[in-house]
Design a protein with these regions (language model features):
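N-terminal pre-catalytic segment of deacetylase/amide-hydrolase enzymes
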Residues: 2-73, 79-92, 238-241, 245-261
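Active-site beta->alpha N-cap acidic-glycine motif
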Residues: 47-136, 140, 144-157, 163-165, ...
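Structural detector of well-ordered beta-strand residues that form the stable sheet scaffold
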Residues: 72, 98-100, 124, 169, ...
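Active-site environment of divalent metal-dependent phosphoester hydrolases
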Residues: 80-82, 130-132, 174-178, 198, ...
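His/Asp/Glu-enriched short active-site or ligand-binding loop at hydrolase and phosphoryl-transfer sites
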Residues: 174, 179-215, 247-258
């Protein structure tokens, strides 16, 4: 029996509909490539991108190529009212970290810095205030770095511990050639990282812990932040799990020392 395509569109309209679908698909793919992939790479930069950064700026610490199960934990914006809780988590799990100190938060917390050093933690320089370091003049940034350096040195002297190599992490994480040159002249190594849960902006501690664990790789440098209530539960989740997976969680200096060939 013959079939009559009573509801079939004329061929001209079918071609037009097909072109419309193809165009819509093209727009979708373009949007994914233009917006979604770059956003995802910012949130979770792939290994090849971190490796490119390390080659492009070899004077900056991003990660350390190694097959050893070892990562550096770095914690910005210390000290705060949460620092001692963070210290307790690290001690309970046989872990250590490099804390990047904001000088404006130190007054009244000098004993906390001393305790951190005595417990095997490391202190890095994060300037005096929580602001983009790149926007400061050379003289202002130099003054801030040296002021924080004095505070850090006093903590090591009080703890009776030798001062380790000097690390600087710029406020907001951005740098340029001028900042890199200035930091080097002051005897510092610029330290960034490869695993960053964006915890200043994202307060969901379970999500942040999962982010860290999903990005975990030998030689990684984790960046997270003190001064937030959600950091403590995030580390309570992430640090024991890293240890369970066989990773050592150490300071920047220990990572560089133990992976040196």
């Amino acid at each position: 029996m013959a079939r009559f395509p009573l509801f079939r569109l004329p061929s001209k309209l079918r071609r037009k509909a097909r072109r419309s679908r193809l165009f819509a698909m093209f727009i979708l793919i373009t949007a994914i490539v233009t917006f979604i992939i770059p956003f995802y790479w910012i949130y979770k930069p792939p290994s090849f991108l971190i490796s490119y950064f390390q080659r492009r700026w070899p004077d900056v610490i991003w990660h350390v190529p190694t097959t050893q199960k070892i990562v550096a934990l770095t914690i910005d914006d210390a000290p705060s009212s949460y620092t001692e809780e963070i210290l307790q988590i690290l001690k309970e799990n046989g872990a250590s970290a490099t804390f990047f100190v904001i000088g404006g938060q130190v007054p009244g917390q000098e004993k906390v810095l001393e305790e951190m050093v005595k417990e095997g933690m490391e202190l890095g320089n994060h300037a005096m205030h929580d602001e983009p370091s790149r926007s400061l003049s050379d003289s202002e940034l130099t003054e801030q770095i040296q002021s924080v350096e004095t505070m850090i040195d006093k903590s090591y002297v009080a703890a009776g511990v030798e001062t380790p190599p000097r690390y600087f992490r710029p406020g907001s994480g951005f740098f340029n050639l001028r900042l890199r040159s200035l930091v080097q002249k002051l005897g510092y190594t610029l330290a960034l990282g490869s695993i960053y849960p964006h915890d200043p902006q994202i307060s969901l501690w379970r999500l942040n812990a999962s982010h860290i664990l999903s990005m975990l790789k030998p030689g990684g440098v984790i960046i997270c932040h003190d001064r937030r209530s959600w950091t403590v539960p995030m580390l309570k989740k992430a640090v024991p799990e890293m240890r369970r997976r066989g990773y050592r969680v150490v300071t920047l200096t220990q990572l560089l020392k133990d992976t040196k060939t």
